[in-house]
Amino acid sequence: MTPDRLPTVFTRTEALAAGVSAGELRGPRYRKVFHNVHARSEVAHETHVRALAALVIGPDAALVARQTAAELLGGVVPPDVRVHLALPTGRLRARGIRAVRRRVTHAAVIGGVRVTTAEDTFVDLAADLSLVDLVVLGDSLVSKGRATSHSMVAAAAEGAGPVGELARRAAGLVRAGVDSPMESRLRMLLVLAGLPEPLVNHIEYDDWGRWVRRYDLSFPERRLAIEYDGRQHAESQRQWERDVDPREELDLDGWRIVVVLAKGIYREPGRTLDRVVAAMRAAGVRGSIRSTEWRLHFPGQ
């Protein structure tokens, strides 16, 4: 083997056998991923490379799991610099790798990396994530076509204890057609406050059957929509935020639209709920804030 034939990640032994000197291995053309495992410097996808490198260290039956698997599957999870592996037997201790014992019967392959399936990844992460983050993950995996809401529910059905209960509850709240994590968070804010759950991504057609508009969250029978807007105003974010509230008074083809920005979820969730409840009453949608659980997940500032 010659240096140009080395795989994406390789061991120090493989590099030396291919004619790469120890000095060259420490130079700018290569980078160390884990102890005795290296990659070419130009290889860009950090998660993919680190996952491959971890599998080089792990036993043959190891799978990439949890947060790392979720990211490779296209799911949205809080950042975690560690690579997570599932091992059917044995143990593995290496800096930057978290390995757990788990017997896996099915696997997916993403870019040459063996990972736990989307459903198994979702259930496993019930041990690490909050309810809202778990729903965000489930929505994103379904959106990527890696699973369905029904397959999530089926996978979570056998879980035991508090972790299993959390997985089942989150799976029951996963929806298809969600466009972004913030839409998931906005929907969960409403649901955890005890408000009726709006329909996800309802499409409105005109009298000729032509597509008119799609609403993030809505009560179509009452022509009420709740939209997350993450765009930056051309002049300034402050000006854009000032423009949002007046837009609630502007109905589009008879629709009342409540526009919610990031601050309405992270900084002012209580005010967002008040705005939505007021709009619901004006539109004739029955519902009120019946739970304080939302405060645990959306504390605001």
Regions inferred by a protein language model and the residue ranges of each:
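Surface segments flanking catalytic/ligand-binding clefts of nucleic-acid enzymes
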Residues: 14, 142-301
